Swiss-Prot record:
This is Probable chemoreceptor glutamine deamidase CheD 2. Pfam families: CheD. Its EC number is 3.5.1.44. It is an enzyme of class 3 (hydrolase). InterPro entries: CheD-like_sf, Chemorcpt_Glu_NH3ase_CheD, Cytotoxic_necrot_fac-like_cat. Belongs to the CheD family. GO terms for biological process: chemotaxis. It comes from Dechloromonas aromatica (strain RCB).
Length: 197
């Protein structure tokens, strides 16, 4: 099915939703996510026609009481997991292209530390640069939440900025907390972990 010819509302209806801390590769089905301070990165190999999207909450692993949960929500984990999965599906690192979105300031933070959204955006640009993957398009920062749709077959990405009202901010915060809580309740895995390099 050629999703690129459908109206955006239909693409959104048919899309697989990617929640905070998750990533996915689909051969054809569109991928969608809702972002606040989080960032989503779309990686695509135009020759292999394979792509995927991730959604992360924090740039790096925090040291704390639940390192397993924090690592699953981190950009470092999300980027390596998506990259490795794409390579397993036939993508070549030299051909990969990126589009990235998010890092909004939807909840005011005070204090001297850099906002989570800004840290996420900076991490994304630095990671892509370090890996030699060109960032073809981006929409970072600002007071907006964003709805992102990605067509993995074509590499097309659509980003809709949304004025963040209290209801939207609460929905995003609730989704992020729910996902983090779900991860915290899972038993620790004995499976081989992704090697971050």
């Amino acid at each position: 099915m050629d999703y690129s010819k459908l109206p955006s509302q239909e693409i959104e209806r048919l899309a697989r939703t990617i929640h905070p801390g998750a990533w996915a590769i689909e051969p054809e089905r569109p991928l969608a996510t809702l972002l606040g301070s989080c960032v989503a990165v779309c990686l695509f190999d135009p020759q292999a026609r394979v792509g995927g999207l991730n959604h992360f909450m924090l740039p790096n692993i925090r040291r704390g009481s639940n390192d397993d949960v924090d690592s699953l929500l981190s950009g470092a984990y999300a980027m390596e997991a998506l990259l490795n999965a794409l390579l397993q599906r036939g993508a070549k690192k030299l051909r990969l292209q990126a589009k990235a979105f998010g890092g909004g300031t939807i909840i005011n933070t005070s204090g001297p530390s850099m906002s989570i959204g800004l840290r996420n955006a900076e991490f994304t640009k630095e990671w892509l640069d370090r890996e030699g993957i060109p960032l073809l398009a981006s929409d970072f920062l600002g007071p907006w939440s964003r709805k992102v749709l990605f067509l993995p077959m074509t590499g097309d990405a659509f980003c809709r900025r949304m004025v963040t009202n209290m209801a939207t901010a609460e929905t995003i915060a609730r989704e992020e907390k729910s996902y983090a809580d779900t991860l915290a309740q899972k038993p620790k895995s004995t499976e081989k972990k992704i090697e971050l390099f």
